[in-house]
């Protein structure tokens, strides 16, 4: 009963934030936006790749589509919009066949309740992964650290959230089913996700390009089976350099009788000519899947290069990389993969 009351109170608060926006219409359109409502815009994100296994796997190699977004955004008023994004991506079915499947990535109502407050309801972004993608433009390489480890179930989920943006801060908090990517809810348990991001230094200094972010997910697989994840990340970015360092701590219990504590560190760096042109990239992930087991540390290295082109609001990138993964036992090589990937976005 307490859970129902809390959810009811949350719904009431979010409706209160959204109500002023629902009543407001556009008075002075700016920029290139249409002068009347509603209007609809379209866009595409496409990740294509060729990947070759260089260690064991019998030389397996394949061309693949790893993301195919068709982005539809309907703006009903200057403050109320609807986002609908189907996604084509590879899945493995029950017979272990790998096929391309169509599923929904976004289906949400977005309300700009005030100048700095956004309310989102439905299948929409969760606080961490979409934010991390906005910092690191190399999502084309594959899932980011926490998602790759299956600690965060997806970049989108069904739920409701509020995002507040200040001059040097941003806070995003939401309640979600916790299954990820619109999967059906399996039980009564929900996930509460929250992120706070701030720039501790003045914008007019070089240190003003430093950003600190913290994230916490408080969730459950089922009764007495927690899925709690804490992440702290620092990033620095200027025209020619991007660097991120991330620490992850998780208490996880997907299948076993006891909680498993996991730890991880992730580093990523990019040296570049600028927003367009040539770039070199490096990544290192260190992950301890169970801190109770001695000498059980996994390492993942990434080396590569890229070239980026922009045209209007569109972007095209080509990325070539080598990814190697090692186990802790005598630094045993687990996998080595060569990847050539393209990103098309407009």
Identify the residue ranges that each predicted region occupies.
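Outer membrane beta-barrel
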Residues: 27-180, 186-193, 197-206, 268-281, ...
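Outer-membrane beta-barrel pore domains
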Residues: 47-59, 77, 94-97, 107-112, ...
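Active-site-proximal helix/loop capping residues that flank conserved catalytic or ligand/cofactor
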Residues: 19-21, 119, 160, 194, ...
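Cleavable N-terminal export/targeting peptides
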Residues: 1-28
């Amino acid at each position: 009963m307490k859970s129902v009351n809390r959810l009811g109170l949350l719904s009431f608060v979010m409706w209160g934030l959204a109500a002023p926006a629902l009543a407001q219409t556009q008075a002075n359109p700016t920029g290139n936006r249409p002068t009347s409502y509603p209007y609809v815009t379209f866009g595409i994100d496409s990740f294509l790749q060729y990947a070759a296994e260089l260690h064991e796997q019998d030389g397996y190699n394949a061309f693949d589509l790893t993301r195919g977004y068709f982005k539809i955004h309907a703006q009903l008023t200057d403050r109320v919009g609807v986002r609908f994004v189907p996604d084509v991506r590879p899945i493995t079915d029950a017979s272990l066949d790998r096929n391309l499947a169509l599923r929904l990535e976004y289906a949400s109502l977005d309300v700009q309740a005030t100048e700095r407050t956004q309310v989102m309801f439905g299948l929409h972004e969760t606080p961490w992964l979409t934010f991390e993608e906005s910092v690191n433009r190399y999502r084309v390489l594959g899932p980011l650290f926490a998602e790759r480890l299956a600690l965060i179930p997806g970049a989108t989920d069904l739920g409701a959230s509020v995002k507040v943006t200040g001059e040097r801060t941003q806070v995003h908090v939401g309640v979600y089913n916790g299954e990820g990517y619109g999967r059906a809810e399996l039980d009564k348990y929900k996930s509460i996700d929250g992120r706070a991001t701030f720039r501790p230094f003045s914008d007019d200094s070089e240190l003003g390009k430093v950003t600190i972010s913290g994230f916490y997910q408080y969730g459950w697989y089922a009764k007495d089976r927690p899925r709690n994840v804490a992440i702290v990340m620092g990033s620095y970015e200027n025209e020619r350099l991007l660097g991120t360092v991330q620490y992850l701590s998780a208490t996880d219990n997907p299948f076993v009788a006891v909680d498993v504590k996991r730890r991880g560190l992730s580093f990523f760096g990019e040296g570049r000519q600028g927003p367009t042109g040539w770039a070199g990239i490096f990544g290192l992930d260190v992950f301890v899947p169970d801190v109770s087991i001695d000498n059980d540390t996994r390492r993942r290295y990434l080396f590569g290069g890229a070239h980026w082109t922009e045209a209007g609001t569109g972007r095209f990138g080509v990325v070539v990389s080598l990814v190697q993964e090692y186990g802790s036992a005598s630094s045993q090589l687990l996998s080595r993969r060569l990847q050539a990937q393209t990103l098309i976005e407009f």
